[in-house]
Amino acid sequence: MKASKLAAVVCAAALSVGTTTSTLAETARVAVSQIVEHPALDAARNGLLDGLIAKGYTQGENLDFKYQTAQGNPAIAVQIARQYVGEQPDVLVGIATPSAQALAAATRDVPVIFTAVTDPVGAKLVKNMDAPSGNVTGLSDLSPVAQHVALAKELLPNLSSIGVVYNPGEANAVTLVELLKEAAEQHGIKVIEGTALKSADVQSAAQVVATQSDVIYAPTDNTVASAIDGLVAAANAADTPVIGGSTSYIPNGAVAALGFDYYSVGVQTADYVAAVLEGKPISSLPAKVAEGSDLAVNRAAAEKLGLEVPASLLDRASRIVD
């Protein structure tokens, strides 16, 4: 474990309300539903488990931590939600918007904690971030889309068009594209859209978009994230750089990315789960945007495209891949 991640776990444990010995003597049942497996969401899940471990929970002893993935299929997410609710765990955790929505729709009684959800209000998970009134609260990973556009502009000063591939069936993706359009308009930049309803469609959509755009923006869309290699391959074939909304896209060939450390997001989510296990009501746990973001640069990917990364970006980057 990296030192920064270990520090995040320790810090989260120190800041959280101490878990009582009597509470830890019982087995806490936590059921996690994740829409699809990809590096960012997997990191969030790992951070969640490590965060709980740092608070004194041990899998197989005083913690029953269950996990299922919907393999990118919202219908499977609904099935998982129904199964979990029937098992009556102490806390349900939905990783990403579709899984969180499925859990929230399946119960009004079992506490639901969401994480890695772009727009909790738009997704109808909560009506008010500051004052959740039902059985649902958690963490948003709303991307700083305006900063992503500024990042693309810094990399390509003469930028006139940004391409984006997304799944219109994901509420989070629709929100991000709307924010992208607003930010791009302020810079006089045209947005070229390509849609992909499933992972298998991402590369073909990217092939079309890449030939019409100066850069491709890869949002924190779960469909795109699960097929990021195909998107980057299509972009590279057209000599079009990729800017990522998640730093998890950097190893796949994104030239630059600004986004959350999803492991840290998971650790922060553990605070919510532990609070519920300690008996705190959902109404006392405001939903909020996760803390912390990183700028990462893939200089090797840039060089393959004949791009020189500005020193201003390199100086600010917390991670550089050569």
Question: What kind of feature is each model-predicted range?
Answer:
Residues 2-11, 18-19, 24-322:
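Short hydrophobic alpha-helices and adjacent helix-cap/hinge residues
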